[in-house]
């Protein structure tokens, strides 16, 4: 009898531990089991006037719940003014280490002489993640992201979170270490998918397969490795949680790879339908947990084409976020919309609970 009781107790403990391990971060933050919680996040605020207009409209007229600001960019004062006039706006820092457009450039806030490895021959930040990877040290990256936070605070803008423009801070482990350290040190949430990452992994795998097929190298059933930056995702997520920060269960960052055929010849109604359909389909595939959905809502003017050629792609995001059909879909399917501000408040409330 005692042996049976002992075995029962051991089984109960094991079941309890397994249940804790399979809890989503959304559950640990107080949302019910099975909840699908979304941060609908607009990148690139401050990059241009058109970007700022897109952000403002997506948040005030649409379903978007959050944004992040590129502090080295020319239109930062405009978006910071909006944030201060609308204090409930959930706005973070889109930590920026690249300047990717040909005719519209910006440099580091920490000074070119302070971070020479971060600048190209024009004195601007490098145009690609690859160039940063091969030229910039982790110490230079650390100096620059801290300078960007310092500028925000000096403008009276206290960011609700940190994330990474073009994913540059995810390109090297030592960059990532500086990024995570800044968040923990300042107790500012960082964008990091530290859960099961089912959508992120599936989309990355599909992208790799598509590229291999294009190159004629794909063979049915071949092993497709997970993205390198997910190798220690769960371990890193646990570290962030232990240090008082919230963690994402998943990341939806595939919308920038969507290419509507002939988008520049389409009407707004056609663009809206195409993008809304894609958001409904992809969001519908998300598993329970806290997911950040990334987009680039923009209201392009006639001049925006001189910055980049993707104005209608970015407008597609805005048209989808303001489409009543998307709002109705989210409501009908029980999605919960949240912000980084609320997520951090819930993390503080959760305390040391596992």
Please annotate each region the language model reported.
Residues 3, 9, 19-39:
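N-terminal pre-catalytic segment of deacetylase/amide-hydrolase enzymes
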Residues 28-30, 55-61, 78-90, 107-120, ...:
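Acidic (Asp/Glu)-rich catalytic clusters
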Residues 37-39, 64-68, 88-94, 159-163, ...:
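Structural preference for beta-strand elements that scaffold enzyme active sites
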Residues 49-73:
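A short alpha/beta connector and helix-capping loop motif
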Residues 106-131, 210-213:
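Active-site gating loops and adjacent loop-to-helix segments of metal-dependent hydrolytic enzymes
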């Amino acid at each position: 009898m005692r042996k049976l009781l002992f075995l029962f107790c051991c089984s109960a403990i094991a079941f309890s531990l397994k249940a804790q391990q399979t809890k989503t971060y959304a559950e640990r933050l107080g949302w019910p089991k099975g909840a699908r919680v979304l941060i609908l996040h607009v990148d690139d605020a401050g990059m241009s006037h058109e970007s700022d207009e897109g952000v403002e409209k997506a948040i005030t007229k649409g379903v978007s719940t959050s944004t992040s600001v590129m502090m080295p960019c020319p239109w930062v004062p405009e978006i910071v003014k909006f944030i201060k006039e609308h204090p409930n706006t959930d706005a973070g820092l889109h930590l920026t280490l690249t300047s990717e457009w040909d005719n519209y450039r910006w440099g580091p806030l920490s000074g070119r002489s302070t971070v020479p490895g971060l600048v190209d021959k024009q004195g601007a930040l490098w145009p690609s993640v690859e160039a940063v990877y091969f030229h910039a040290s982790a110490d230079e990256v650390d100096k620059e992201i801290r300078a960007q936070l310092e500028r925000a605070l000096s403008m009276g803008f206290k960011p609700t979170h940190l994330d990474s423009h073009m994913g540059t801070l995810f390109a090297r482990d030592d960059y990532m270490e500086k990024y995570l350290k800044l968040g923990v040190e300042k107790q500012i949430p960082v964008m990091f998918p530290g859960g099961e990452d089912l959508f992120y992994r599936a989309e990355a795998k599909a992208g790799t397969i598509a590229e291999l097929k294009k190159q004629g190298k794909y063979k049915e059933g071949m092993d497709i490795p997970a993205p390198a930056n997910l190798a220690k995702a769960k371990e890193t997520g646990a570290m962030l949680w232990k240090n008082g920060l919230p963690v994402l269960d998943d990341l939806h960052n595939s919308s920038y790879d969507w290419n509507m055929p002939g988008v520049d010849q389409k009407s707004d109604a056609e663009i809206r339908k195409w993008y809304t359909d894609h958001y409904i389909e992809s969001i519908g595939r998300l598993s329970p947990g806290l997911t950040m959905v990334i987009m680039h809502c923009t209201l392009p003017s006639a001049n925006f084409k001189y910055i980049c050629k993707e104005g209608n792609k970015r407008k597609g995001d805005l048209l989808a976020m303001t489409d009543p059909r998307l709002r109705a879909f989210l409501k009908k399917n029980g999605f919960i919309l949240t912000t980084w501000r609320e997520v951090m408040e819930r993390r503080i409330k959760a305390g040391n609970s596992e």
